[in-house]
Structure formats: C-alpha cells, structure tokens
UniProtKB/Swiss-Prot annotation:
Annotated residues for binding of substrate: R47, G48, A49, R90, Q197, N248, K249
This protein's name: Methylthioribose-1-phosphate isomerase
Keyword ATP-binding belongs to the record: no
Metabolic or biological pathway: Amino-acid biosynthesis; L-methionine biosynthesis via salvage pathway; L-methionine from S-methyl-5-thio-alpha-D-ribose 1-phosphate: step 1/6
Source organism of the structure: Caldanaerobacter subterraneus subsp. tengcongensis (strain DSM 15242 / JCM 11007 / NBRC 100824 / MB4)
Reactions catalysed, as given in the entry: 5-(methylsulfanyl)-alpha-D-ribose 1-phosphate = 5-(methylsulfanyl)-D-ribulose 1-phosphate
Length: 345
C-alpha cells in the first residue's frame, strides 16, 4: 500500500500536494503564511472537505507564527482577522467552519498565556485535527467495507481519497479497504467535469494503489446503472443537513436520481464533522459558484466560443430520500435520517 500524505506541517511550513498539477506533475505547494493557505484553498491547491479543514487549522498556526513578535493586543487582533479570512476561503464545506471553530475555541481558552504558549496550543490542536481525520477515515473504511459485496462493481464521483483528506480517504477509503481485504472489486470513476477531479485525482490514486478501474465520462454513468453494471455507488460529502440532504460535488444529485430509479444502493461516506447540526435541510446550504473559465477552458486552453455565458456551481444537493445510508466513523446512519443523526450529537 502506498501512503499518500496530502499535507505535512514541518519546520514552520505547511507542505501541500499541489492538486492542480496532478497527475502530470507531483509537486508540493509551500504555505508560510495564513494568506498562502487562504489562496491554496480558494485556488484548489488543496480540496476535499476534510483536507480543507485540516489545512485551515494549520493556517491558523501559521498566523500565530507570523504575528509572534507582536504585542499581545495586536497579536490577538491579527489572529481574529486571520480566523475570519480563513473561515471564508470556501463557503460550502462545513469542515472548514468546524476546524476554524475548534481553533478559535483554543485561542479563546489560552488567550491569557504568553504568545509562544498560544502558538504551541494552536499547533497541538491542529495536529489533533490532522490525526483525528486519519483515524476517522480508517474507521469509516472498515465500517463501509461491510456494505461492499465480493466482486462488487462500484461507481464513484469526484475525488474522495487520500487527496481529499489528510490521508486514506472517505468513499475512496472504503474502496481501498475493500480492495485490500481481497473482495476483488472493480471501480468506475466519473471524470467529474469541470475540474476533472475524477480523471486527474481519483484515477491517479487508483493507479497508485493498483485497484482495477476504468475512467468514464460523467454522461456514461446512467447507461452503466441502467444496464445493471453497477452494484453500489459511493460518494463523499461537503455538508450534510439534519434531514440527511447532502451537498457534494456537482453531478452527485444526477447520479442519485438514476440510482433510485434502478434500485442501486447509494451511500454517502463522510465523517460526523461534515454534518451541520445548525441547518435542517439542504435548502439552507450555500452553493459556491466558481469561475466561468473552469468550464470554457481545460488546462488553460479555451474549448468554448468567446461570448458564451456560463453557470458553474461547484456543488449540488442530493435529497435524503435518494440516499441509502450515510457511512460515518460512528456507524452507518439510515432513515429516518433526522432522528438518527441527532443521536450522534
């Protein structure tokens, strides 16, 4: 098994695998300031809800490092500003808000200590978030493996692997576990337009792991489902409402509709940190809209005519009634979702 480490905090620098460059180039993006982390999240150097949360936590550590020599009052003001900036890097993934909330809580708790002690406390919390995510992913993988039958053909969307987390992955983590437990699985990976996370990232991870797979255009998925060639669908999540409505990469909703028509099990794999206990339904989830160039260009080359308008939401919401279950580190949540989600609070 090849270990993929999405990020590493070492000697006061956060090193991120630059996911914009994969699969053609394996490079690291160095973050030395919280502004670097803000940019990395916005520009999708790092992406995937759990990975964004962990990166933002280390962004807070970098902010403390930046302002270490400031007087306490200015230090705390600058830290509050950094927390606010990082919390707004991307709007849809709740793990970002969750991680910043944890870092803010630590800062509030230790604000009367020396600046150097505050820095150490923040670094300790960021490290906790990192290692908790890794452990959570491995727990989800083992739990999720229970729903994978031997010789299963699995369809997945976007990237939910090690690159979307600090390591191992969510939905792709379940796939990884099924493969290494000898279940002889086969994977179809959607290319996932417009950013092509499936083609660039998931396909790369599958090749690295030696997992049998084929890459498909997004428009092929419905035909495979109709023809009975898919046994189960596994996707990730960026935010889950109390009723089970799930925001995930654009195109997920479409898959869920076809899966429901043809009675194919449709599972969301996400840590409980992705559940937003403050919203009732998916209607309350803010959907990020991204640059038109993501649709009109590929790798900087224009593929659409000048003058055409573009609608480019990064996510859509899959209604809870289309979801078979939500696989978390605490077990599989099944309908009625609201009742069972509240038990985890």
């Amino acid at each position: 098994m090849k270990e993929i480490k999405t990020m590493e905090f070492r000697d006061g620098v956060l090193y991120l695998i630059d996911q914009r460059k994969l699969p053609l180039s394996y490079e690291f993006f160095e973050c030395r300031t919280y502004q670097d982390v803000d940019f990395a999240i916005k520009d999708m150097v790092v992406r995937g809800a759990p990975a964004i949360g962990a990166a933002a936590a280390y962004g807070v550590v970098l902010a403390a490092q930046q302002f270490m020599k400031e007087e306490k009052e200015n230090f705390l003001k600058n830290m509050e500003n950094a927390l606010n900036v990082l919390s707004k890097s991307r709007p849809t993934a709740v793990n970002l808000t969750w991680a910043i909330g944890r870092m803010r809580g630590v800062l509030e708790k230790v604000k009367d200590l020396s600046v150097s002690d505050i820095y150490e406390a923040l670094k300790e919390e960021a490290n906790k978030i990192y290692f908790e995510d890794l452990e959570t992913n491995k727990k989800m993988a083992k739990i999720g493996n229970e729903v994978i039958k031997p010789n299963a053909v699995i369809l997945t969307h976007c990237n939910t692997g090690a690159l979307a987390t600090v390591g191992y992955g969510t939905a792709l983590g379940v796939i990884r576990e099924a493969h290494y437990s000898g279940k002889n699985i086969f994977v179809y990976a959607d290319e996932t337009r417009p950013r092509l996370q499936g083609a660039k990232l998931t396909a790369w991870e599958l090749v690295q792991e030696g997992i049998p797979a084929k890459l498909i255009a997004d428009s092929v998925a419905a035909t495979l489902i109709r023809d009975g060639k898919i046994d189960i669908i596994l996707v990730g999540a960026d935010r889950i409402a109390l009723n089970g409505d799930t925001a995930n990469k654009i195109g997920t909703f479409m898959l869920s509709v076809v899966a429901k028509v043809y009675n194919v099990p449709f599972y969301v794999v996400a840590p409980t940190s992705t559940i937003d206990f403050n919203i009732e339904t998916g209607a309350e989830i803010v959907i990020e809209e991204r640059s038109p160039e993501e649709v009109t260009h590929i790798n900087g080359v224009r593929i659409a005519p000048e003058g055409i308008d573009v609608y480019n939401p990064a996510f859509d919401v899959t209604p809870h009634e289309n979801i078979t279950g939500i696989i978390t580190e605490k077990g599989i949540i099944r309908p009625p979702f609201r009742e069972n989600i509240l038990k985890l609070r």
